[in-house]
Amino acid sequence: MSKLFEANGTLASPSPPQELATAVRAPARVVSSGYSHGGASYAKKSMIGWRSTTTDADEDIVENIETLRARSRMLYMTAPIATGALKTIRTNVVGSGLSLNSQIDAGFLGMSDEEASDWEANTEREWRLWADSVMCDVERRQNFYQLQSLVMLSTLMSGDCFVITPMIRRVGSVYDLRVGIIEADRVCNPKDNLEALKKNILGGIEVGKYGEAIAVYVANRHPGATARSTDTLEVKWSRVPIFGDRTGRRNVLHIMTDVERPAQRRGVPILAPVIEELKQLKRYSDAELMAAVISGMFTVFVTTPSPDESGLFGGGGGLPAMQCIDPDPQAYELGNGAIVRLAEGEKVEIADPKRPSVAFDGYVQAVCRHIGAALEIPYELLLKHFTSSYSASRAALLEAWKMFRMRREWLVSSFCQPVYEEWLAEAVSKGRINAPGFFADPAIRAAWSGAEWHGDAQGQLDPLKEANAAVIRVQNGFSTISREAAEMTGMRMDSIVRTRAREEALLKSAGLNAAGGTLPVEEEKEEKDE
């Protein structure tokens, strides 16, 4: 860089132009470094108009959540792809319901395997007494397995939902625990903004000094709904502590979709990243459908040359009444085999829509691939379009089941297991289940509360290949019979063994051959990928 002053303080001689240009560009090289040449650039033409800001999760999510919920629900109700995506996740994650498989820590509790098995069987029997009945529901509409489906679908659609666990006595019910599902919209800020600011309430959730949720504010009705009783003429809010102050009992379960950021209070609808794509696809599909319908219409327009002429068929007397459409001065209507009379001098020119469009299917497939990538649902499963080879279809299902298993574990830890632990505490306190030390030591309580939850199996594209693969895994010690039985059929191994024993005894008593066997299997040649 050239000098501006000499050592004696006099002004230095002018530098050559190239040196001055270098001196001016030097600071720019320091500032324009690293990501400023790429994603952080404001100089590139592709980035120059992109302005973005950073803020916390509450600003990004809670301030926009009402719009996201409304649009997500509208897409679920009107867009087939959105409806299919949510129902596909719900059906594969929950299916007919996740069933309890009690698994206590027998070694820690000092129990033999036989004693533990008896205790688990009795506990599952008592659990079914409560879970299989609609009495478990606050509204007495659904059993526990149907509530799982509602929780999953509501959470996917709205971003989150809330579950309350009140104790309500009812005639004919052994247990008092009830499960109530609260839609996301009902948990919102009270009208008193000053009070909400004092207590750090946002999105209807009050947080403490460490950022922990300590209470939710529940409206007595949906804020956007019409009052249907005198009790709900005015929207009022109730503060519900998430944990009991005296016992620490869970009063509220916050079932939330993927937590994306620290200090996030509310969940985001799963369709949020693809709302625009789904809406545009819906508009395009509607336009193509209407164009195809119009191109399929056959309508005859009759032009009358002058008022004196009687027109086609002698004044229209030969036309069936159902085929005649009285002209509207504002519009004409197309119909199937319809005949429309035109006024004197009027003519009709119809543009050929050239439908169906040959590009429609390709465009829909391309957009659905993008949507499926965001939702973690392979394109084949999103559209139920399995036309590729066995290997490609199986790869798509395996990829999808990574997500289904993750969401199944999430549902278990967020909803099923906490509700089971609340029910077990009541069963022990009522003396219907014997669990020594349950309330004395948290470690003992956790040992009694151990459980696994099994749902519907994944399903198989080629049952023969899947069964042979399972046999090989078990024979070589890579897996267990219990695990393979659960993954292939959704059933527990001990249940299968007991059922088979009864079946074989029944067959023998009838004089039938109860022996099973396997036939030699010739592996089919793997299909080549298309």
How would you label these PLM feature ranges?
Residues 142, 166-167, 291-297, 382-386, ...:
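Short coil/turn segments at secondary-structure boundaries
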Residues 77, 81-108, 147-156, 271-288, ...:
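Short, Φ-rich (hydrophobic/aromatic) sequence segments
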Residues 2-23, 368, 395, 410-530:
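C-terminal anchoring/interaction modules
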Residues 1-112, 530:
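N-terminal-proximal low-complexity accessory segments that begin disordered
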